[in-house]
């Protein structure tokens, strides 16, 4: 294993402050950085020696021997304090400190467990539920207790039968915990989509789930809560899917409990390395992930590493970019256009993508439900675009293709195409799946 690099900002809020110095010996569970504001403790994920400390990161040279033993966090009568002490953050999204989220009084409301595994091709959340459903459910109960929630709902796609069966068995004697089945449509894991699907409440783009007396918590986060309370384990591990053009094959290979801060290259070594020429390496999912480098460190929020096939060469073709809140921002879309060797002649935004505040990422007005994009497509055609590069959800992609390709003769490329072709997944074009899901669980 190469050097471990622990970024001091891998959560929502302010960067943490390092409390170690070069030359210090550390173990798994050694506290190495503490919050300076909104944030979460950071612990060493390996046995080793601190090599470098900067304003951005702590670099650790791991020992050759890595015992499983870790330094436990302090025991407390307060479960919430143990969650805060463990440094847990949201492990499926932006990394909001879990101790802060669970401290909100839901007044008898809901914990919504996000098990959608929203990004295509990833499997680490589902594998966790298949293998550790009972402990995950105990984590849900702890979250309910800390948040004063009376009910909990697992939001999971109907296609994941084995995981659904495992959850169903684990909650058989728990009437306050239920399962809501989701369609296999992107972005069903967006937190406002989870609230809408589970509770029938459409929040405004500026509203948090707490407005519906709910907290949306990623299923891995829930498991780490159980580990903190039952095992006094600090947040030092992350479950990661490695996907794409690697020697192990394009299907997702899941690695549980990888040390936070392990490099992308070390993770790729675990699958035999990159298989020949490639387009880019993405940290995160096909929709919301960003290009990364081999020496980049993983964090508490890293869910996937994807290696793609090379990009097609558009030979300078004129393209319009349709930026959506569901996918990459304008900078990411321009990056993709450049990698396709295309000339950007127009940039517009999905009509559902609401600007909440200047400079902040846009929010979808109603995630996964599209009212039509004809005006946006026409705008790009008038600007001279021959191709459209889009980052839309399943439903919006369907409407763009219908009006752009069939009615206006434009060629459509989805920002995820190079990933989907790599993993042999259907391209995002036409919506062929119903958005309504039968909630009958008798077959599971």
Model-derived regions: residue spans:
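Structural motif
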Residues: 112-114, 216, 389
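Iron-sulfur (Fe-S) cluster-binding modules
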Residues: 1-90, 100, 108, 144-159, ...
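Hydrophobic alpha-helical positions that pack around
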Residues: 159-264, 270-276, 285, 296
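Conserved alpha/beta core surface patches that mediate binding of polyanionic ligands
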Residues: 89-109, 123-126
